[in-house]
């Protein structure tokens, strides 16, 4: 570590670091709490983060030294490197888990397998920790260190779609769920929702109450009031997660276009956001990186020779002309990204939301 890094780590925690750590620790899902416990047991450090109430966590973060904060943030950024196997609270159960979900062997193999021995061999090949009725597999290599002590704003904590806090009569204070839940695409292998239900001591989502909900899309507000059924919110939260994973199946500038479309439509509801994501073809889009050359490309599209376009560009107010063309063609600027967007004439398919009234659509276009 060089002198500059040592000096940075010697400074008190910034407000941003405290807020990041407090929020991340307060919203840990049940699955993530298993992963964090395994990470801490593996390293033998950060014991102060385990088993704390909200107030205790805040006090812990306030007392935290900068070098510990850096380690804690890096640990929290790499929880996904720890695989949670459930149910697998014993060697016998771990062997059964492997046989059912990972081996590919037919079901009629089960009576002939020594599950305890299989579980122990699995542990030999995949070192980990038994915790909470699960087996958490350690990463095969040291997790990448994302945080250096001064790049908090650059950290990419975006591998989620919706966070839910759900409660049960047995646990009225509730637990967090971090969507998407991948059980449906992983042969029903237990994931976020099932682990939360286990902790809440209930059998189904219908036995739970929604206490809080947060969406990764800053445009989307008040999920609790938008959804009357928790199962519907989980379904849509999963769909958003899968959609963000796919990135429009390789669509160029997907995130930039998606957020520009959300702003263009003044979208504040998750259902409408999902419809917009499925209908991005209905928007013409000029990404920020193409804005500067928009005027030149327009002139070229009119059949003007490249040499003449270059000459005109040298002798005109390019920025004013560019803005004139964009406005004339009905584009609106997305302030956050600097890109431009407009609706085209393709039919928009509404599945989770209602089309705007003619008056509302007219006002939106003004």
What residue spans do the PLM features occupy?
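Mixed-charge (acidic/basic) macromolecular-recognition segments
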Residues: 2-112, 116-120, 134-159, 172, ...
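A short beta-strand micro-motif
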Residues: 161-169
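Non-Sec secretion/translocation targeting segments of pathogen effectors
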Residues: 114, 317, 352-366
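Short coil/turn segments at secondary-structure boundaries
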Residues: 310, 337-338
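Generic recognition of long tandem-repeat/solenoid scaffolds
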Residues: 137-138, 340-342
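Short, surface-exposed polybasic-aromatic patches that bind anionic ligands, especially phosphate groups
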Residues: 123-124, 130-132, 319-329, 334-336, ...
């Amino acid at each position: 570590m060089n002198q500059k890094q040592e000096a940075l780590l010697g400074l008190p925690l910034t407000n941003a670091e405290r807020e990041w750590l407090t929020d991340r620790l307060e919203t840990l899902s049940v699955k993530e709490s298993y992963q964090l416990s395994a990470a801490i047991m593996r390293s033998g450090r950060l014991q102060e983060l385990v088993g704390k109430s909200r107030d205790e966590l805040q006090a812990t973060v306030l007392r935290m030294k900068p070098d510990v904060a850096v380690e804690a943030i890096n640990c929290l950024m790499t929880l996904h490197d720890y695989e949670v196997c459930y149910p697998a609270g014993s060697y016998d159960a771990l062997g059964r888990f492997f046989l059912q979900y990972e081996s590919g062997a037919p079901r009629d193999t089960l009576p002939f397998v020594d599950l305890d021995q299989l579980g122990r061999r699995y542990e030999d090949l995949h070192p980990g920790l038994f915790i909470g009725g699960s087996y958490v597999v350690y990463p095969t290599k040291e997790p990448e260190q994302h945080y250096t002590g001064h790049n908090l704003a650059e950290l990419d904590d975006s591998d989620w779609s919706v966070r839910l806090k759900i409660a049960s009569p047995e646990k009225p204070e509730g637990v967090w769920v971090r969507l998407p839940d991948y059980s449906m695409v992983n042969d029903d292998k237990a994931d976020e929702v099932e682990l939360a239900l286990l902790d809440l001591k209930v059998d189904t989502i219908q036995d739970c109450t929604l206490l809080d909900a947060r969406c990764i899309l800053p445009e989307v507000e008040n999920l609790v009031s938008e959804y009357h059924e928790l199962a519907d919110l989980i379904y849509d939260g999963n769909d958003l997660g899968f959609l963000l994973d796919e990135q429009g199946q390789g669509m160029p500038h997907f995130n930039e276009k998606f957020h520009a479309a959300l702003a263009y439509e003044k979208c504040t509801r998750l259902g409408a956001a999902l419809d917009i994501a499925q209908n991005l073809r209905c928007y013409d889009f000029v990404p920020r990186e193409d804005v500067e050359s928009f005027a030149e490309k327009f002139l070229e599209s009119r059949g003007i020779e490249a040499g003449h376009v270059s000459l005109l560009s040298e002798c005109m107010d390019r920025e004013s002309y560019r803005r004139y063309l964009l406005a004339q063609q009905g584009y609106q600027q997305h302030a956050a990204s600097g890109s431009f967007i407009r609706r085209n004439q393709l039919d928009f398919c509404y599945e989770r939301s209602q089309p705007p009234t003619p008056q509302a659509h007219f006002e939106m276009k003004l």
